[in-house]
Amino acid sequence: MGARSESLVGVVLLFQLLADRLWCAATASDSLYDVSYSITAIKPRVDEMVSVDTHMYSHRWKRQSVDTNRPSVGQDFPDMFLEGTNENGTEIEEDTDHKYYTSRTYGPLDSASRDLWVNIDQMEKEKVKIHGILSNTHRQAARVNLSFDFPFYGHFLREITVATGGFIYTGEVVHRMLTATQYIAPLMANFDPSVSRNSTVRYFDNGTALVVQWDHVHLRDNYSLGSFTFQATLINDGRIVFGYKDIPVPVMQISSTNHPVKVGLSDAFVVVHKIQQIPNVRRRTIFEYHRVELEMTKITSFSAVEMLPLATCLQFNSCSSCVSSMIGFNCSWCNIPQRCSSGFDRHRQDWVENGCTEESKDTVCDDLLQTTGISHHTTTGLHATTSIYAFTTTTRMASHFPSNLPTEDDTKIALHLKDNGASTDNSAAEMKTGTLHTGLIIGILILVLLIITAILVAVYMYHHPTSSASLFLIERRPSRWPAMKFRRGSGHPAYAEVEPIGEKEGFIVSEQC
């Protein structure tokens, strides 16, 4: 019994090794450009595969020196700012991204740098929360609920994820590769709060703004550089402020070997598609559609960066206001989701599935007017009109996925969406596909059971060579079959079976990920 149990354990370990090898192969590509973070205090994770595809779309930057009458963060946090900075004002360098944000960088001599820094030490101590786990771990992230709606790239957030690596993750799909996209990064680097007793990660929410501060944190791979103190402030009007108090070395000198080094913003949309071979399992692919990269040479002690949100299509709630908008986007209105969009936001999959890429912004509003006129034309034909409208809606739903998409990016995304594109008219095909999936699973299970049975029989014969079952199989091995004997004597060359003089030791080398 002892030998048999050891054999079973060996079989289990063999399958575990194969599973680990497959997992390593699946995640190897992600590890090339990202690092893994552990998530604490979140909802149970859904067992789904997540991959990150960092597609970048070109955007222009404009640099100029300007004066500003921007509202100060002091309106949200009065009398709680860093003291001792120089009051002399200098020119403000404005980097204008003509898409989603305008960034303004203030040097250590700018008075605005003092105004934008929130002195968290002067706040009510009972309202300042020091996160115990983040302050004592490495590569850890935790969910934080907001008391207000925070607009990020036009989307309203009520929950964020604060990471020890100097950034905030803003995505709804929580995965381990948080540094890839969907982040707010005042200074993303390989910080480890656990290496020093003075290192903390704390935050404060006063109902209109959230301040997250990384206080006296050190780099894990270069502790001798000194401690960093910086913060990110998220304001309910969409403004984002990065404040820097202690930056002991130029940011360009921070190593990115073990962790990405980034300063800026990023957002992405998620495409969910099914896997044909495995039912009830979905795969999420994350596409980055925009990124703001700030100049790292401008990040110094007592400097600050303010990012002002620009108008987006998502803020328009009607067809007329959408198509007549004069902003930096080509806004279009889609009837089915009742949404205004440029086509690239977090609702991208819904936009493509509903055929919104085919709708013209010049004719959509006219269609809405015609539909309204039909509904008020007569009351006697109410039932007939309702039936026609339902039929039209069903037809539209059946053709949600466009047959001819205008751009290469749309085509690539559509290929992912086809896995989800089963319409209401294809119920029979769905049942057939479900039957095929069931048969495939049963076949795989039978094959696995046969392989396990063969392995167990071989192990049993090895440990019990004199048993009746072993002798029975040995006497009926293929070399004893009549056909094999006839072939051996038919003039065809054959190899003779010989017993080895001495046994050779074999070994298996297993590599870990």
UniProtKB/Swiss-Prot annotation:
It is a single-pass type I membrane protein. Residues 25-438 are extracellular. The keyword Glycoprotein applies. Glycans are attached at N88, N145, N198, N206, N222, N330. Residues 312-357 form the PSI domain. Residues 460-513 are cytoplasmic. It comes from Xenopus laevis (African clawed frog). The chain crosses the membrane at residues 439-459. PANTHER family: PLEXIN DOMAIN-CONTAINING PROTEIN 2 (PTHR13055:SF11), TUMOR ENDOTHELIAL MARKER 7 RELATED (PTHR13055). GO terms for cellular component: membrane. This is Plexin domain-containing protein 2. The keyword Transmembrane applies. Its main location: membrane. It comes from the Eukaryota. It is found in: Membrane. Keywords: Glycoprotein, Membrane, Signal, Transmembrane, Transmembrane helix. Residues 1-24 form the signal peptide.
